[in-house]
Amino acid sequence: ALKNGADYAFDPLEKDFAKKVIEVSKGGVNTAVEVTGVGAGLNETLDCMAKLGRVALLGCTRISDFTVDYYSKVHFPGISLIGAHTHARAELESSHGNYTHIDDIKAILRLCANNRLTLCDVVKETHQPSECEEVYQRLINDKNFPVGVQFDWKGEW
């Protein structure tokens, strides 16, 4: 994270994680992206938020066997939860806070051009398309599945 431009990096499993985040951010973060799709991850993210903060729910939280204290973690501090499924976005017309797929691609390219993001460091595995079923099963079942897994579509498949 630090190599890709993050100002700080903390282990969410460490004691007092939320307290550390609130301390360095001087009262909590304004924006967070929850990527795990795990209820405990959402709860921990909410614990790190500043008043009127926004949380993008990028992780696919399809398991409903967790609880959130919505009053103290969402309603009282005025937190906005934003569903980040790409099908919910405008296709062509972006507006403040509502960006298109093309807007996201341009933002990623700007981050790369300014050395704030190095995609080569993100890619951990490359597979042939013929391996897609095996890779997908790992994605579903392996809690340690790497973030950067890609398919090589150039070869014969």
Task: Please tell me what each predicted stretch does.
Residues 49-51:
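Helix-to-beta-strand junctions that scaffold the AdoMet/dcAdoMet cofactor pocket
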